[in-house]
A protein has these predicted regions:
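Ribosome-associated RNA-binding proteins
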Residues: 1-183
C-alpha cells in the first residue's frame, strides 16, 4: 500500500474536473490541462469534491509490484497539477555579483553574467517570467516540474562560486563560503 496514494485529493472550489475515459480534464483560473490517467489506475470523483486514486484490482501479480511503486508517484503528479491550476507555482531567482543584470526582451531573457557576451535564454510558452528589478527573476507556471526545470536551466548559465558567493541563487538562499588557501 502507498502511504500517499491512500489519501484523497481535495479539489479547490475554483476548479472544474471532467473525466473522459482515461483523461482527466482540469479547468481553472489559469486555463485547462489534460491529465492522462495510467490505464492500470482508476480515478473516482467523490461527492464531497475530492478525488480517490487507486490501482485496478484485476492485475497480474507481477504487475502489482510495479503498480505499488508507481502509485505514490502518480498521486503526487496529479496533486501537483491540481495545485498548479488553482494557485500556480512561483520561484524567485536573485543574481548576486558585480555587474550581473537581467532584462526581458519580448520572449527572451537577456542576462549579463560577467562574460564577454550577453546570454540569451528563450522562455518556454507555458512559463511566465518577470523581472521586477535588474537583479531579480520571477518565474511562474502551472506545472511544478516545468517551473523547476526552467529554474535549473537558468541557474546552469552561471555556476555558483562558493569562494566569492556569486552566481544565480534562489531567493533567501544563504551560501556558506569556503575559505581560500592560507600560507
Amino acid at each position: 500500500m502507498s502511504n500517499l496514494g491512500i489519501k484523497e485529493i481535495k479539489v479547490p472550489s475554483n476548479l472544474n474536473l471532467d473525466k473522459q475515459q482515461d483523461t482527466l480534464i482540469i479547468k481553472g483560473d489559469f486555463g485547462q490541462v489534460n491529465y492522462e490517467i495510467d490505464s492500470r489506475f482508476s480515478l473516482d470523483l467523490m461527492e464531497n469534491g475530492s478525488l480517490k486514486f487507486y490501482p485496478k484490482k484485476n492485475l497480474v501479480l507481477s504487475e502489482r509490484k510495479k503498480i505499488k511503486a508507481l502509485w505514490g508517484t502518480q498521486y503526487s503528479l496529479l496533486k501537483n497539477y491540481i495545485q498548479g491550476m488553482s494557485q500556480g507555482y512561483k520561484k524567485t531567482l536573485e543574481l548576486v555579483g558585480v555587474g550581473f543584470r537581467v532584462s526581458l526582451i519580448e520572449n527572451d531573457l537577456v542576462l549579463k553574467l560577467g562574460y564577454s557576451h550577453e546570454v540569451h535564454f528563450n522562455i518556454p510558452s507555458d512559463i511566465v517570467i518577470q523581472c521586477p528589478s535588474p537583479d531579480k527573476i520571477v518565474i511562474f507556471g502551472i506545472c511544478k516540474q516545468k517551473v523547476n526545470e526552467v529554474v535549473s536551466l537558468i541557474q546552469s548559465l552561471k555556476k555558483i562560486d562558493l569562494y566569492k558567493g556569486k552566481g544565480i541563487l534562489l531567493e533567501n538562499t544563504k551560501l556558506r563560503l569556503k575559505e581560500g588557501k592560507k600560507k
